[in-house]
A protein has these predicted regions:
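Conserved Radical SAM active-site core
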Residues: 1-84, 91, 98-104, 263-295
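Local cysteine-cluster metal-coordination motifs and their immediate loop/turn environment
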Residues: 234, 242-261
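Active-site beta-loop-alpha junctions enriched in small/polar residues
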Residues: 8-10, 55, 76-80, 115-117, ...
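Auxiliary alpha/beta "docking" domains used to position bulky ligands
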Residues: 55-56, 159-163
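A C-terminal junction/extension of Radical SAM enzymes
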Residues: 172-237
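Surface-exposed cleft-lining segments at the edges of enzyme active sites
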Residues: 80-88, 116-126, 161-169
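Conserved C-terminal portion of the radical SAM core fold
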Residues: 93-160, 180-196
Length: 295
């Protein structure tokens, strides 16, 4: 299996020490978000690769050489300020972290996500064009692939409409973004791609590809993986991964996040984290049913 660490919360940013404790002990327990009494026990001997997804990869860097599994990084890096990404650290530090990671695991294993693209009076198309070009310039030689997506109508987006103040992205916006982003990427030796987007931007120079394709999964593990996206009803063809995260436990508090939408619950869960526990949040009870997961 390939571990997703994590699409539900930013384990790398806030819980790296816990993850390394689990790695050293050889297993991790994951509570089923839809049936909380069920717990999957995952042994790292059954793990073929690890995909780290984070807005702040800095805390995990010191541990990377200890991890004897193939690693992929998806690092989200946008031009948004604290009004949208409330607790995300200084972007200059993140960029330096990306460079360090690229040197450690290789440029082909590091993906940057400019994600999601949203338009309002502050974050105009012109703003994004300039921010994306600056990003490409700073990461030239350290990143080959940048993934973009456009904002989706998640629960948290609806709850934060007073903050986001979204404007509709029309075809003219898509064309300008596509042409300008593609030009910036090419000038800095990168490829810009989309995944699970209904709009076809290939005519503007984007590549339609998957965040974790069957080809890439085979390259890093030597195994064939079936398509197993949880994003039903989309054009996503990413391979199946196993997420070990926990919803509503990320203190980044990004206004557009799909996985963290209850601020009170986020604070409670964060306080219920124990770095020595086998679970990310909380502890195992007598009523829990633990089953080993192999794939």
């Amino acid at each position: 299996m390939i571990l997703n660490v994590s699409g539900r919360t930013d384990i790398v940013a806030f819980y790296s020490e816990w993850f390394m404790n689990r790695y050293k002990e050889g297993f991790v327990d994951v509570r089923n978000p839809f049936n909380p009494s069920l717990i999957s026990r995952i042994y790292f001997e059954d793990v073929d690769a690890i995909m780290f997804c984070s807005k702040n990869p800095l805390p995990i860097i010191e541990y990377l050489k200890e991890i004897k599994k193939p690693i992929i990084f998806h690092i989200t890096l946008t031009g948004y300020k604290r009004d949208i990404e409330k607790n995300v650290p200084n972007k200059k530090e993140i960029i330096e972290g990306i460079k360090r990671i690229s040197k450690i695991i290789g440029i082909d294993r590091v993906f940057v996500r400019y994600d999601p693209v949203l338009i309002n009076e502050e974050y105009t198309v012109d703003y994004h064009v300039k921010a994306f070009d600056k990003l490409c310039e700073k990461l030239d030689g350290y990143v080959k692939n940048i993934i973009i997506s456009f904002i989706d109508d998640y629960k948290n987006v609806q709850n934060n409409m007073n903050i986001l103040k979204l404007k509709t992205i029309d075809n003219n916006d898509l064309e300008r973004i596509g042409i300008c982003f593609s030009d910036s990427a090419k000038r800095h030796n990168m490829m810009v791609q989309t995944c699970a987007e209904d709009d076809n931007l290939t005519e503007y120079g984007f590549t339609k590809n998957d965040c974790l394709s069957q080809r890439l999964a085979f390259e890093i593990t030597g195994k064939d993986y079936k398509i197993g996206t949880i994003r039903k009803g989309t054009s996503c063809n990413c391979v199946e991964t196993v997420d070990i995260g926990y919803y509503n436990s990320c203190p980044h508090m990004c206004a557009y996040c799909y996985a963290n939408y209850n601020e009170k619950e986020i604070k409670t869960n964060y306080l219920n984290h124990n770095k020595t526990s086998s679970l990310l949040i909380g502890k195992i009870t007598e009523k829990d049913i633990i089953k080993r997961r192999y794939k």
